[in-house]
Amino acid sequence: MVMVKKNGSMNLIISIMILTLCSTRIAADGFIPESFSPPLLISGDDFVLEPLGPRLVEIDYIAYMSSIEHLQRTFSRGGSWPNDSITREDAMIDMQTEQGRFEARESFAYAVLDLDREVELGCVYVYPSKKRGFDAMVRLWVTAAEYENGFDEKLYEWSKNWLENDWPFSPTRVAFPGRDISWEKWDLLSEKSD
């Protein structure tokens, strides 16, 4: 995810540096076991998941830029992502950052693609939880067109099953804030201590 204000290239670089530092500390605490290999290409019913990276920059950019208002209402808590000032250059930096986090086992961002892997329908993000009582926090979004087709709920249900069956987390320790727990309740949970 890229959060950039107008003329915000420096803000983007600073945000990426801060997020990288924060996620590196969390990764050191053992987000996933060393023995676990994060899935690389996952088949759903009528879609596939592939880790975000430079290969997907164009279709990822097209997907979220086609749904700016929808994603600001349904995904971005602050309403600042995506926005029309994001450039393809910003998008490439984001893809490289997501790929780096995946390879470092800090967080796992996946594009949700059609079966031909040419159109992005949305994304799924698996992050370490900063809240007590949870090991992972999962966020997801779908494009406005896919939302209208009912794919948002389908992807959410599929993702819950996928995390339960294919990841090393107890189902009771995976949170989908804004879905299975309200953002208000999530925000009130205690942070994990340093």
Residue map of PLM features:
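Bacterial N-terminal signal peptides that target proteins for export
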Residues: V2-I13
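Residue-level detector of intrinsically disordered, flexible termini
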Residues: M3, I26-A27
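N-terminal signal peptide c-region/cleavage motif recognized by signal peptidases
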Residues: C22-S23
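GNAT-family acyltransferases
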Residues: A28-E146, W158, W162, D166-D194
